[in-house]
Amino acid sequence: MQMIDRRGFLVTAALAGLGVAAGGLRASAADTRLRCVWWGSADRSKRTNDVIALYQKANPQTEVSGEMIAGSDYWTKLATSMAGRNVADIFQLEPSTIADYSGRGACMELDQFVGKSLDLSTFGKSEVDLCRIDGKLYGVGLGLNSFCMMYDADTLKGAGVTVPKEQITWKALAELARDFKKNGPAKRNYWAVPYGARYHYVFDVWLRQRGKLLFQDGTIGFNKEDAKEWFAYWEDLRENKLCVSADIQTRDDNTIESNALTLGNSAIGFAYSNQLVGYQKLNKQTLSIGMLPGEGPGKPTGHYYRPGLIWSISSTSTNGEEAAKFINFFVNDLEAGKVLGVERGVPPAKVVREALLPTLNETERKTVDYIESLSGKLDSYPEPAPIGANEFDRGVMRPIADSLAFGRASVDEAAQNLVDTGSRTLRKRG
């Protein structure tokens, strides 16, 4: 993957391709109706609905019904609609779920529409292939992102601590949390850092820094000792009251609104880089962005570029061609690109990136600069996640970490449970 010059805006790197549906006969042009669902913040919902309005204005023969589903309910409703063969024509996925849901038969294969309803001419092959599973294209990457740490630099500075420009180490983060407790604001239920044991994507980065993987060959890529070391790090912070308490941390449902940073309980939050736009809208303090902690200079950072979010088309849709046209508009139209900004990540289409550059505000520019700063510091993109990866996050890792945080399990028990239950939950595709 190669970065283009800064005036050219950003990478030719790592984004996923655009998708077009393969299903069924197209409905009459006079009465084509599409359903489109996603999760995310109110800001994302407004941007998406504004693009839907633009599309309908340009295509009055098509009606697009958009719906934002709260993150806590999205996957439950998607599973229910899959069981009833009533999945929306266009639905949002992410890297850890596209492999899972395509393996369950929920996603249409999109290759047959490339170069027809779907223009991929500004995408490199490596960009398209990020949403290719077992050689078949199942989704459309909507923006480039990576993992990150967002933080209130002014509040940290007021406590006499700072986050270095380069990647902070895990040891230094623990020391920062200790110093913040001593010198930070006298504010009830306020810490420097979250209780990060429950974040599967942070665990993913931590494992990569040690030469391990979260998933490998259709199952877990780590062992009990890895899990013990991970859980022990966070338990040491929690037991010394240096991180967000269990009763508050367990409210986090991996949404911007429920993160301890947004709730005013921590000065630092773990997230994905494109989410800076949404976090800043809900935080009065100016937020900074940097890498998740690491092991120090010269060591693997554990980060990689990823398609932040993905549009897929339901395998049961009877309006596949029109759904493909909508996705094509979503990622290639200049006006749509200006509305969407970088809220879902840095746009994959070069022409959209270049048109967007002069319009970015300070927060959006931080997102782009962060993605650019990662060039030359990244790991390779992982193999497709196994079937059950979404359940591993929501139904395995979070509950086990929460049980540990509430003192209902020891580090050893939690680690063994993560290995055993994780192994049972995952299965290889095909």
Give the location of each predicted region.
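N-terminal secretory signal peptides and thylakoid transit peptides that target proteins
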Residues: 1-17
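Extracytoplasmic "Venus flytrap"
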Residues: 33-50, 69-71, 145-146, 384-389
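Extracytoplasmic "Venus flytrap"/periplasmic binding protein-like
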Residues: 50, 54-123, 157-160, 258-268, ...
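Hinge/lid segment of periplasmic solute-binding proteins
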Residues: 95-148, 288-290, 360, 365, ...
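Extracytoplasmic/periplasmic solute-binding protein
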Residues: 134, 138-142, 147, 171-223, ...
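Glycine-centered hinge/linker elements that transmit conformational signals in sensory
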Residues: 176-178, 219-249, 292
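Mature extracytoplasmic/periplasmic domains
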Residues: 274-277, 309, 314-391, 428-430
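C-terminal capping/gating helix-and-loop segments adjacent to ligand/active sites or protein-protein/ligand interfaces
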Residues: 368-421
